[in-house]
Regions:
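Non-ligating segments of multi-cofactor redox enzymes
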Residues: 1-227
């Protein structure tokens, strides 16, 4: 049985963060993961994971999708070294259910913005891939916690967006993107989503300007607009 500490160490050497693990059941295997015993999620948390990408060739070569290409290279190499299969949230359709996997692997919950909220990192974390193992691993027991959003009556995240893109009906992607394309959207483009930044949980983990701006430009680029 593979030790989780060995897997975590390998992921950290690759510049990323181990984001929890879970053992699969028969329903998972029937859903297309036959032969897989356990999954370890790989991603970023706060600033952890950013510096390795920012120093990579992919970040500077000017080609599309640099973060996805870097994730594929790094996580693919980890999979080869650890005898696992690499899975990615951006490969599909069908796309692997990374949000559901995350809620099995870590004490995260769906926030009012639709993003998963972590008790330490707040909304400042992501999942870049997963390692699927054909043999069992020693999956850590998760200390389950209530969502921090349950005790937040003010919910500043829902009122901070300049164009009200977040509400009871969900996320108005078109309104958000249209705002970012205008001069009035520079605060979001340069410093990151204002609704996300309004959340007090994990505020110290918020992306610094270079990281925030990269992700906002990538968001616009995915919607056919230059960042």
């Amino acid at each position: 049985m593979l030790a989780m500490a060995l897997i975590e160490s390998a992921i950290e050497r690759g510049g990323l963060v181990a984001r929890g693990a879970f053992a699969l059941d028969e329903a998972d295997r029937r859903a297309g993961l036959s032969g897989v015993e356990a999954i370890v999620l790989v991603g970023a948390a706060g600033a952890r994971g950013w510096s390795a990408f920012a120093a990579s060739p992919e970040a500077r070569d000017g080609r599309p999708h640099p973060l996805d290409r870097w994730s594929r290279r790094v996580i693919g190499a980890l999979a080869t070294a650890l005898g696992a299969r690499a899975l990615y949230p951006f490969e599909g359709p069908p796309y692997p259910p990374f949000q559901r996997w995350a809620m099995r692997a870590e004490p995260v919950h769906v926030s009012p913005l639709g993003l998963l909220i972590h008790p330490e990192y707040g909304l400042w974390h992501s999942y870049r891939g997963a390692l699927a193992f054909a043999e069992p691993i020693a999956v850590p027991v998760i200390a389950r916690r209530a969502s921090p959003c349950e005790a937040c009556s003010a919910r500043p995240c829902l009122s901070a967006c300049p164009v009200g893109a977040f509400g009871e009906d969900g996320y108005d992607v078109a309104a958000c993107a249209a705002h970012l394309r205008k001069a009035a959207g520079r605060a979001c483009m340069d410093g990151g989503c204002l609704a996300r930044r309004a959340c007090p949980v994990g505020a110290s983990q918020a992306h610094r300007p270079a990281q925030a701006s990269f992700h906002m430009r990538a968001f616009l680029s995915a919607r056919g607009a230059p960042g």
